[in-house]
Amino acid sequence: MRLLPAFPILTQLLFLLPIAAGLFGVLLPALGYLPDLGGNQFHFKIFNQLLEHPALPHAVLLTLFSGIIATIISLSLAVLLAAMLSRESLSGNKKNKMTSLFVIVRRGLIPLIAVPHAAMALGLAFLLAPSGWLVRWLSFLLMGWETPPEWVTLQDPFGLSLIFGLVLKETPYLLLMLLAALPQIRAQEYIRIGQSLGYGNFRSWLKLVLPQVYPLIRLPVFAVLAFSLSVVDVAL
């Protein structure tokens, strides 16, 4: 029993030690210490080259823009879809309609979430490239193009294709987190209260349900933001 208060600290250390090992494994070579390749002295040459690179400011701004905007859009779409599902659940008379509808949606979301990000990005590239499947279908059905159009649909300077890919991948995840959190706050009761006050379904969601459910999905939202700001394979 005396060791019981130390368990939270030991648990945190158990999770932090692998992170610290990975962090040192990245920082030491970045500081020039990599004995296997002859680097036995610490220096800041690599960081100086990074800071002097002319594309660094644009890269940082583009990373922040694409990551934050993708997270905001994904969360907004997830909230909108959850509100629509709640409205459909309230439109029926069966008490178990909400549960069955949410179960069906959850089962449909799981395969989407299981798709790797790199596989999704590769499929999206084949679809949206200037010579991709979408352009080929348009050319065959409507346009009659003989050569691919000179469109910058991938790796555009504003990161729009990256944002689109992240939104497609992260919206199902946030929607699944929302659907899992809604039963914990009795969302349907809040919606009925809002409707009794004259609010519509979506406005009741924004004013009553969202403030209650957001603390429950805050960590998943932060996880989406962290991934969107650090992802490499999707951007490539």
Residue ranges and their predicted role:
Residues 46, 123, 192:
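Ca2+-coordinating acidic residues in Ca2+-binding motifs
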